[in-house]
C-alpha cells in the first residue's frame, strides 16, 4: 500500500472551524426560538392550537402525496405526527427553501445552453443496444433522463489508490496549455494540494485559464478564510458552492459532492478522493485510507467539462460564453475500447438518477454484484434489489470500512447487515482502515465509478457524479481491485443476521427510522 508521506496523528483543525461552529449554533438558536414561539402560541391561544393540528394534518397528506422515496416520507410523517409543531417547522425549512427552487431554475437554464453542445445523435447507443440490449438499456436511461451521451473514443485508466491518481493528475496539470477546471467537495491547503497549487500558479503565469470550485462545508475545516483571496491574487478564478451563513436555510443540507478535474477538454479525472491529505495517507486518522479514481482521455471528457460549467455558472447565475473554447471541435483518435458515459445527479432533479443507476445495474446482474462504499444507509428499494439478486443466485458482495470515520453512521450501516446476510449477501469490513471508494461492478463487464455513496445523502441530497463503463479494459483492473479487497478485508459472519436481542432490534429500528434524514 503506497504512502505519499509521513503518517501523522490526527490534529486539531484551526482554520475555519470557528465559523462553522458559529453558524451551527446560530441556526440551532433560531430553530429553538421559532419552536418556543409557536409552542407559546398553541398553548396560549385555542385558535393557534387548532390551526397547528390542522396544518400538521394537511402537511402529512402533502408528504404522503409527494413524489419522493417512501422511506423518506415515512420518516417525515412520523416526525410531524409525533412532534407537530417542531415537525412542521423542520419540514417547511427543508422543503420550503426558496433558494432550492432558485437553484433548480438556474441549473435548468444553464443546462439548456450547455447540453446541446454534446453529441445527442444516439448512434453509439444504438450500436451498443445491438451488441447487448440489457446493458444498452442502462445507458439509454441516462441518455433519456439526464441527456448524457455515451462515448466510444475514450481511453479510461483506473487508479486503485488515490495517491496514484494524484500523481497522474499532477502530470496532466503540468502539461495544460489552455485551461484547467477543478471541482471538489473538500480541499485542504496542505501538502497534497500544495503540490497542485504550485502547478496552478505556474500555469496561470504561462497564460493558462484556471478555475477552482469547491464546497464550503466540505472544505471549511481544511482551508483558511483568506484562501479565495490568495487564489484570485494569483489569477486563479475561485468560486464557493453554497456558502454557509448563520441563517436558517436548509438548502445548506444540499452539498456539492462532485470531484472533477478537466485539462484542456482532453483529459478528465474523477473518483472518490478529495484534495486533502487524509485521502492520500499523508495524514491517517482512520487507519489506511482506501480510495480509487479514474482518468478519461478523449470525447467523454466533454461531459465532465459541461458538468463543471453547469455548477460554475448556476452558483452565481453568470452568463455562459465561449463554450467552443472549452469543447474541442476535432478529437484525436484514442486507444479507447468499450463504452463510457459520464453522468451526474442533482437533488433538484425530478428523478433519483443516482439511485436508479445502481438499481438498474443490480437488477440486470446474472453472475455477480461487487460494491465498495463508506456508508450503507439505503432505501427499501435498494435493500430489496440486493436481497433479490442474492436469492436468485447472484454473487453479491459489499465492502465497507473496518475503521469508520463516523461511529454513529457506521452503527446505522451495520443495522442493515441482518436482512442482507439472511438473503445471502456477503459483507466485508476493510480491516486496514477506512473504505472510501465508491464502485459497483456487475458481471465483470459493467461498472460505475465516481462519488456516489450507498446512502441517502449521495442518492438524494447531494450533487454527485460518476462514470458508467461497459467492456472497457480498465474493468479488469477494477475486478482485480475487488478481489484484492476480498483477500484483505474481514468477512462478516452470516450469524450476525440471526439471534438478535430485543434491545438490538429496537436500537436498530430507531436508527433506521432516522436514517433517511442523514
Model region roles, listed by residue range:
Residues 185, 374-375, 409:
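Glycine- and other small-residue-rich loops at beta-strand/loop junctions that grip anionic moieties
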Residues 1-356, 360, 364, 404, ...:
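N-terminal localization/anchoring segments of enzymes in phospholipid and broader phosphate metabolism
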Residues 357-361, 381-387, 391-392, 412-415:
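Exposed, interaction-prone extracellular/peripheral surfaces
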Amino acid at each position: 500500500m503506497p504512502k505519499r508521506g509521513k503518517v501523522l496523528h490526527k490534529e486539531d483543525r484551526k482554520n475555519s472551524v470557528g465559523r462553522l461552529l458559529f453558524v451551527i449554533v446560530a441556526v440551532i438558536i433560531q430553530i429553538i426560538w421559532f419552536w418556543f414561539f409557536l409552542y407559546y402560541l398553541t398553548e396560549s391561544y385555542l385558535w393557534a392550537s387548532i390551526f397547528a393540528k390542522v396544518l400538521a394534518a394537511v402537511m402529512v397528506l402533502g408528504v404522503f402525496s409527494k413524489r419522493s422515496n417512501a422511506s423518506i416520507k415515512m420518516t417525515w410523517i412520523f416526525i410531524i405526527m409525533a412532534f407537530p409543531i417542531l415537525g412542521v417547522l423542520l419540514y417547511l425549512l427543508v422543503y420550503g427553501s426558496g433558494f432550492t427552487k432558485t437553484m433548480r431554475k438556474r441549473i435548468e437554464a444553464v443546462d439548456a445552453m450547455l447540453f446541446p453542445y454534446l453529441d445527442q445523435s444516439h448512434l453509439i447507443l444504438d450500436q451498443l443496444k445491438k451488441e447487448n440490449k440489457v446493458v444498452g438499456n442502462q445507458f439509454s436511461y441516462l441518455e433519456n433522463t439526464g441527456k448524457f451521451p455515451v462515448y466510444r473514443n475514450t481511453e479510461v485508466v483506473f487508479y486503485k489508490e488515490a495517491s496514484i491518481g494524484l500523481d497522474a493528475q499532477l502530470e496532466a496539470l503540468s502539461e495544460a496549455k489552455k485551461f484547467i477546471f477543478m471541482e471538489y467537495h473538500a480541499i485542504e491547503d496542505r501538502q497534497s494540494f500544495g503540490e497542485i497549487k504550485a502547478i496552478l500558479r505556474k500555469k496561470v503565469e504561462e497564460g493558462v485559464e484556471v478555475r477552482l470550485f469547491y464546497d464550503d462545508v466540505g472544505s471549511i475545516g481544511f482551508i483558511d478564510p483568506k484562501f479565495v483571496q490568495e487564489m484570485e491574487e494569483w489569477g486563479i478564478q475561485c468560486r464557493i458552492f453554497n456558502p454557509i451563513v448563520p441563517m436558517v436555510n436548509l438548502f445548506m443540507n444540499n452539498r456539492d459532492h462532485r470531484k472533477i478535474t478537466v485539462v484542456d477538454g482532453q483529459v478528465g479525472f474523477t473518483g472518490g478522493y478529495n484534495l486533502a491529505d487524509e485521502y492520500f495517507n499523508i495524514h491517517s486518522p482512520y487507519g489506511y485510507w482506501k480510495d480509487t479514481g479514474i482518468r478519461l482521455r478523449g470525447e467523454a471528457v466533454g461531459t465532465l467539462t459541461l458538468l463543471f460549467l453547469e455548477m460554475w455558472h448556476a452558483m452565481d447565475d453568470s452568463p455562459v460564453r465561449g463554450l467552443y473554447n472549452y469543447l474541442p471541435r476535432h478529437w484525436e483518435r484514442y486507444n479507447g475500447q468499450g463504452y463510457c458515459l459520464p453522468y451526474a445527479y442533482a437533488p433538484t432533479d425530478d428523478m433519483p438518477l443516482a439511485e436508479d443507476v445502481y438499481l438498474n445495474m443490480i437488477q440486470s446482474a446474472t453472475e455477480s454484484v461487487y460494491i465498495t462504499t463508506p456508508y450503507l444507509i439505503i432505501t427499501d428499494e435498494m435493500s430489496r434489489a440486493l436481497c433479490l439478486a442474492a436469492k436468485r443466485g447472484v454473487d453479491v458482495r459489499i465492502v465497507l470500512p473496518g475503521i469508520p470515520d463516523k461511529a454513529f453512521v457506521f452503527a446505522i450501516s451495520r443495522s442493515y447487515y441482518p436482512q442482507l446476510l439472511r438473503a445471502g449477501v456477503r459483507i466485508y469490513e476493510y480491516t486496514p482502515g477506512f473504505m472510501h471508494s465508491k464502485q459497483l461492478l456487475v458481471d465483470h463487464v459493467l461498472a460505475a465509478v465516481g462519488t456516489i455513496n450507498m446512502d441517502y445523502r449521495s442518492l438524494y441530497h447531494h450533487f454527485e457524479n460518476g462514470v458508467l463503463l461497459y467492456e472497457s479494459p480498465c474493468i479488469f483492473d477494477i475486478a482485480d481491485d475487488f478481489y484484492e479487497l476480498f483477500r484483505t478485508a474481514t468477512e462478516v459472519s452470516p450469524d450476525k443476521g440471526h439471534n438478535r436481542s430485543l434491545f438490538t432490534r429496537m436500537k436498530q429500528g430507531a436508527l433506521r427510522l432516522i436514517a433517511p434524514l442523514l
